[in-house]
């Protein structure tokens, strides 16, 4: 299951989702995309979305979850509530890789974004804009890393 942001708006985050889907397809992995609502980031909404997904897929037709940190953790919680095991029955991988993926049990495998570097680049670009520099379709790409947790390995 691939939790993705809303396609109702144009956003650079679509690139990571399209690339994820392409690579999974290339590897012969079938994905079910669950599209999250635009601009909804609260835990209650994530709980609703995860429950909605699990209710729709009442048969265990999936063995993995890929979503933001909070979505992946809520999926892990729902798997456990339904008396299944992580990672034996369902593996969970988060993207963002904030500290919360390390303080839950089991710790969540995460694609870690370089938050400090993202903040520095954002501040640099804002300062340059304030000082009169103009950009057209400026794109900054920073590398990510994988931090292995216990949600993908037994």
What function would you assign to each model-found segment?
Residues 2-51, 66-73, 95-97, 112-121, ...:
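Hinge/beta->alpha junction and helix N-cap segments in small-molecule ligand-binding domains
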Residues 54-154:
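Flexible loop/turn connectors
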């Amino acid at each position: 299951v691939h939790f993705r942001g809303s396609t109702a708006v144009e956003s650079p985050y679509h690139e990571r989702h399209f690339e994820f889907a392409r690579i999974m397809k290339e590897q012969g992995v079938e994905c079910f995309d669950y599209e999250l609502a635009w601009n909804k980031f609260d835990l209650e909404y994530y709980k609703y979305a995860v429950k909605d997904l699990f209710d729709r897929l009442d048969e265990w037709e999936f063995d993995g979850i890929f979503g933001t940190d909070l979505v992946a953790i809520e999926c892990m919680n729902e798997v456990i509530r339904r008396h299944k095991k992580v990672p034996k029955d369902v593996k969970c991988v988060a993207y963002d890789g904030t500290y919360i993926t390390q303080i839950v049990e089991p710790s969540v495998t995460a694609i870690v974004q370089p938050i400090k570097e993202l903040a520095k680049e954002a501040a640099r670009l804002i300062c340059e804009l304030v000082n009169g520099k103009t950009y057209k379709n400026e794109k900054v790409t920073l590398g990510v890393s994988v931090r292995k947790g216990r949600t993908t390995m037994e």
